[in-house]
């Protein structure tokens, strides 16, 4: 009986592995690099927008991929005269505008007008978003949360900007905020470089 059970188990494992192997062989990966159109091969952020475009943020520009070809774009606000090409975070809001986090703050891309606008805003206390952005997310009530490790966490809503100092300046190098999670119940959690988490 034990011998028959052992043989059946071995046959099951062999046939299962063959089925898994056949399923895996149907995948095909195509590589997109600097050699075939990407502005730079160090990709730091990826998002698919509601139009179906794939966006790749690199150390040297923003790239839009339609499944066939790549269009290289620069985050240049020609009205203000600022720009940045080191892309670190991407997010699409409810108005279908792309938020682009760079190492000098946030830009918004309006696809209808095909323009970038620098988010040169300040909180009521005079704090502005002017450093490297690690993450951008939204919650269910329309707040957009922006994590800037060198500063803290910002919340944007109704054309106003609010600032949350996650940790005090003494511990900022080891406790700088880096990632953020908005739970379905609305709670906002921030993770730091030092391994701590905070609820806002």
Predicted feature locations:
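Carboxylate-rich, polar loop motifs that coordinate divalent cations or form catalytic acidic clusters
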Residues: 1-200
């Amino acid at each position: 009986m034990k011998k028959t059970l052992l043989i059946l188990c071995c046959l099951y494992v062999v046939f299962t592995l063959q089925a898994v192997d056949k399923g895996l062989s149907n995948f095909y990966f195509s590589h997109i690099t600097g050699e075939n159109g990407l502005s730079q091969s160090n990709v730091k952020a990826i998002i698919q927008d509601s139009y179906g475009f794939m966006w790749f943020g690199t150390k040297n520009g923003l790239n839009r991929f339609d499944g066939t070809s790549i269009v290289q774009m620069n985050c240049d606000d020609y009205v203000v005269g600022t720009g940045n090409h080191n892309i670190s975070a991407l997010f699409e809001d409810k108005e279908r505008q792309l938020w682009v986090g760079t190492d000098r703050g946030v830009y918004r891309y309006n696809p209808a007008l095909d323009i970038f606008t620098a988010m040169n805003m300040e909180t009521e206390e005079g704090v502005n978003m002017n450093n490297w952005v690690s993450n951008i997310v939204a919650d269910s009530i329309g707040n957009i949360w922006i994590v800037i490790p060198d500063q803290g966490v910002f919340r944007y809503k109704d054309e106003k900007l609010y600032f949350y100092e996650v940790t005090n300046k003494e511990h900022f190098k080891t406790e700088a905020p880096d990632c953020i999670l908005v739970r379905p119940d609305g709670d906002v959690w921030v993770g730091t470089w030092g391994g701590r988490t905070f609820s806002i």
